[in-house]
Amino acid sequence: HRVYVEMRFTVRDCSSLPNVPGSCKETFNLYYYETDSNIDNKISTFWNESPYLKVDTIAADESFSQVDFGGRLMKVNTEVRSFGPLTRSGFYLAFQDYGACMSLLSVRVFFKKCPSVVQNFAVFPETMTGAESTSLVIARGTCIPNAEEVDVPIKLYCNGDGEWMVPIGKCTCKAGYEPENHVVCKACPAAMFKANQGMGICAQCPANSRSTSEASPICICRNGYYRADFDTPEAPCTSVPSGPRNVISIVNETAITLEWHPPRETGGRDDVNYNIICKKCQSDRRGCSHCDDNVDFVPRQLGLTDTRVFISNLWVHTPYTFEIQAVNGVTNKSPFPPQHVSVNITTNQAAPSSVPIMHQVKATMKSITLSWPQPEQPNGIILDYEIRYYEKDHHEFNSSLARSQTNTASIEGLRPGVVYVVQVRARTVAGYGKFSSKMCFQTLTEEDYKSELREQLPLIAGSAAAGVVFIVSLVAISIVCSRKRTYSKEAVYSDKLQHYSTGRGSPGMKIYIDPFTYEDPNEAVREFAKEIDVSFVKIEEVIGAGEFGEVYKGRLKLPSKREISVAIKTLKAGYSEKQRRDFLSEASIMGQFDHPNIIRLEGVVTKSRPVMIITEFMENGALDSFLRQNDGQFTVIQLVGMLRGIAAGMKYLSEMNYVHRDLAARNILVNSNLVCKVSDFGLSRYLQDDTSDPTYTSSLGGKIPVRWTAPEAIRYRKFTSASDVWSYGIVMWEVMSYGERPYWDMSNQDVINAIEQDYRLPPPMDCPAALHQLMLDCWQKDRNSRPRFGEIVNTLDKMIRNPASLKTVATIPAVPSQPLLDRSIPDISAFTSVDDWLSAIKMGQYRDNFLSSGFTSLHVVAQMTSEDLLRIGITLAGHQKKILNSIQSMRVQISQSPTSIA
């Protein structure tokens, strides 16, 4: 250590002393001597100067004279000297005077140290200074309770003056503790936490979490809430999402497009994605198993971020169940399986697979005869084969085509000695399959042909002789047989044919049979509809009334099958035989159809009362009312998906030569997955004269739904698939307008007159131009110019594959290419109240919203904004647009008219 000596003393100025000898001094010396024992022997040599070490000669800064002494003004000096380092237990100080007139007033001996201190949340002990005045002594610190070191070990330096300097490292409060006054780490109270070590303070527990003890580094999630592995402790606890909504499935042969709405509840997270679980089922949808690896999912099967997936390579005519799971970052933390929505579909017939191989049967100079096996997966009846061939040295673009009704073909008109590349593909009613792999075959050269001919000459001669003998024998036999032949009348067919080959149909295509062609209508019912024992049927509730009786929701439990929901049409008591025949004719019609977009007949009950027709149950009911209830809630792609399903069903019906005659949104049913199915195949309304329903108007002895019917069908009763296409165009308009009434409040006669004058419906609000153009195509006056349903399906498929084509919204040009009906905006001056105005624009359901919020006059209503509509409870986007458009027109009319408006 180093020792400091503070001396207070006075010195008299030598010049102020009279008769001062020359030995007068004004300084003295300071010495020290280290020892391990007391030295108090007067004769000891240690009292001599020699063992002492001189510290310094001490001189006074100020001295005093005799004058000062007389006035008692002593000038005291204070000097501090240090020495060291000391290595022994003690030391002696010595002051040597060489003749100075001085007084040593006091001596203070001390050493310097750095005091104990708390700095940077660490405690540093009392530390002695170093041996030299410039020395720095390192002091190691210890973190205070509930604090931890950060990075490097913490230390301070004690300098020669006893001051701390140069701090290195620090401690901070550990997780669960917060700093207080920079010297204490205080525990976080209950309901608060601190996740990390550092200077941060405690915070309230995030949403859906709690802490019940002090010093919590993390808050525990409440029941049903979780944190993902990558979530920080500061993040709120979240839950799993609810299931996806409003699934639309579009089946295209052995592929399907699925679309859906996101879950209503995301669990408080923004990382929702979707998994598709594919299950292939038996025909009764029992014994489902996971799909194999051959099924393709685009963009992928798991972790989808978009609400759309395209699935292909499915089996033909096979029931599938697809589960669309909604998952997020905490789904794997929940003990429960992900929420999902299921959709059941049945694939259609696909095109055949490729032909595996070809064989050369024969070759000549100008022809090649080939044969091949049937495709491994014909997926239907092979109608014919198409052969593509071209010279190997030429490009594929120069290929030629040939067709064969069998699996052999002779390609004629070839060049001698040339190698040809040949491919073949099969065709069914579903279309062409893929071409086979390329194979090469060569025609004979002239030399090869002559050589082969020489080898066959003996065989040809022998065959000719045998042929003459055979012909003579054959003539004799034919003479004998002709005498025994008798002609009989053609046998009468005992069974009705269910498959015809017509000029329009393809071989093997099932054709619709009109049940009214049966002499006994019961025969048609037995042939096309399955009889169900009434004990298997349970009626639950009335859901409507049909033309012949009430309609119920019920349950059907067939033996060895699961129970399903069904719709049950009943025939009211007191029916006539004609009414019974008409009632059951719909079942005879439905029973002939098997398509995912046609309502499915489960069976009939005819052996007990009441007579029943049992069909699959469609949860969302009729399409028109469903759209009105969900105005503005679907994307354009979802609406197009609905239209595509309806068109696919109608394509199926038209290919069976069935004409619907009453295609309208009210006759389309919607299930829980938003799959649309064509229904209502009863013909009785056309045979009666019931004026109770204004939708149907008498024409030429029958009932016609004028607003949906093609002009040739109204005028001439000419119903064809082309007239169904016209009706489909009206259905398109209904869908895009969310269930508005076609031609609004026009009378049926006004509608007929407008159509005859070539007026057509304008595009509904926000309707894509491409869809309105398709409507106009369906409404061509010349029925031969209208598209077929197959073309409509293809057009809609292209729109679905290219959503950008639907972004252009249709507008009515100043000079339209075709005159469009104008639903003129009502004259505001004709209204006397807000109630009248709302009724005129078909928004009367919001009357109480307006009046209870103070919007009681049209002048006040004219100033409303979209925010006002939200505030009074109008949340549907479609209704907001409709009301705002009318309000905007109201403002214009108010500004242009001086008429007083209520």
UniProtKB/Swiss-Prot annotation:
EC number: 2.7.10.1
Record-linked InterPro entries: Eph_TM (IPR027936), EphB1_SAM (IPR042819), Ephrin_rcpt_lig-bd_dom (IPR001090), Ephrin_rcpt_TKs (IPR050449), FN3_dom (IPR003961), FN3_sf (IPR036116), Galactose-bd-like_sf (IPR008979), Growth_fac_rcpt_cys_sf (IPR009030)
GO cellular component: dendrite; early endosome membrane; plasma membrane
Residue span(s) of domain Eph LBD: 1-119
PDZ-binding (motif): residue ranges: 900-902
GO annotation, biological process: axon guidance; cell chemotaxis; cell-substrate adhesion; dendritic spine development; dendritic spine morphogenesis; ephrin receptor signaling pathway; establishment of cell polarity; positive regulation of synapse assembly
Residue span(s) of domain Fibronectin type-III: 240-350, 351-448
Keywords, ordered alphabetically: ATP-binding, Cell adhesion, Cell membrane, Cell projection, Endosome, Glycoprotein, Kinase, Membrane, Neurogenesis, Nucleotide-binding, Phosphoprotein, Receptor, Repeat, Transferase, Transmembrane, Transmembrane helix, Tyrosine-protein kinase
Tissue specificity of this protein: Expressed in the embryo in the brain and spinal cord and in the first and fourth visceral arches. Most abundant in adult brain, with lower levels in eye, heart, ovary, oviduct, lung and pharynx.
Domain SAM as annotated: residue spans: 829-893
Name of the protein in question: Ephrin type-B receptor 1-B
Organism (species): Xenopus laevis (African clawed frog)
Lineage: Eukaryota, Metazoa, Chordata, Craniata, Vertebrata
